[in-house]
Amino acid sequence: MSERKPSRLALIGLVAVAVIGSAAFYLSRPGETNASEALDKAKASQKLQSLTELNGKAPDHRKLDVQTWSTAEGAKVLFVEAHELPMFDMRLIFAAGSSQDGDAPGVAVLTNAMLNEGVAGKDVGAIAQGFEGLGADFGNGAYKDMAIASLRSLSDKDKRESALKLFAEVVGKPTFPADSFARIKNQMLAGFEYQKQNPGKLASLELMNRLYGDHPYAHASDGTAKTVPAITVAQLRAFHEKAYAAGNVVIALVGDLSRAEAEAIAAQVSSALPKGPALPKIAQPVEPKASVGHIEFPSKQTNLMLAQLGIDRDDPDYAALSMGNQILGGGGFGTRLMSEVREKRGLTYGVYSGFTPMQARGPFMINLQTRAEMSEGTLKLVQDVLADYLETGPTEKELDDAKRELAGSFPLSTASNADIVGQLGAIGFYNLPLSHLEDFMQQSQALTIEQVKAAMNKHLGTDKMVIVSAGPTVPQKPLPAPTDKPSEQPLGVPEH
């Protein structure tokens, strides 16, 4: 939860979905071309458009003709034809993230990780070789709200049909072999041991626990060292049966396919999944009380995290908050936080803020690392910057610059098939209008200073913050005075 999302992609608020689950494997054989190679060759053959050529204008944005329907089993499908490359991308987004773990934290991540570990007649190695031999890429991942399985394949009928057959088996009928289950559990347990040496992770876990209490978002997606060993294969099978049901998935498809071919693919995949309805949406969290916590950790630096409940994905203030946060701390250099904390005082390498809208109210967070002996003063400085921003709002120049950056980076949201399939998946998963991207852009460009200020004050309050620090308890020093050229640069390389 403490990782920062790149500001240019946060402009849509969906690009996290466009890239998660992207871990894939492939091995090309002599004389064969795989889907990723086809994409790389196409990119290499295109002339890059330089910033000089753009002459200050935003690059062209690719408008999407989104087609949508539902399969006989209840799966929602979103499809965009794209015939430029002989390939297609498919992403299945299940409401099967860790918020559905119930009393077994970690079961969602384990279930997803086990999908490609075995099917009837094939172990994990044979599955990998099967995709590789077809020039196809498989990817999967599980998070708070969702679990994902993805396929990239050449659109040639022979390769496509074989890849789809294997993909449908992997997603719909995994066997959950015991040896793989033990291996992945051990990997997760090793990860928990590593977390003990990561103050940023420890602070993040404590922060989410304080922020969400008994809500399903409180626990880490991968569970804990206590919960994971107790999870059984029977629990994985039961979770797969209900959470990977056809009624609980959105199928996003982009590529060199006709509507008829896309319908056939969606029907094939949907029919391979367990039969069942969508799972109920999780409840909204209860507003926590403001609090301050500290984790003692031997280090030269202190991790600082501030958070409060933000918004869900349906909030009408989404565009205004995205713009407001971009100016506060969502970008790199030039944001309010970065200017005051790093550029003028040299207290950190980076300080970032962000909303994470989810099915229920996700967190708004500010996080940074700073010298331990200046941690208290730095925390107060961050709080003062936020308070001042809420009181004054953005300047006209800040708002104009943020709008210009958004307009310039907006085309990246649909620059490739992988980008598009991620956008479609998010639109379908969060039940957004098909025109969401254009709507968001229009709303953002029309924002006024007053609207941004009002939205930020409506959803944020300096008296609501949950604060967690992780680092040593040491005598504190006063902060340096602000200057255009800080005499002391940030200490060393950021830890962890």
Where are these predicted regions, by residue range?
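Short conserved segment of the HATPase_c
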Residues: 196
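M16 family metallopeptidases and their MPP-like homologs
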Residues: 80, 85-113, 124-171, 185, ...
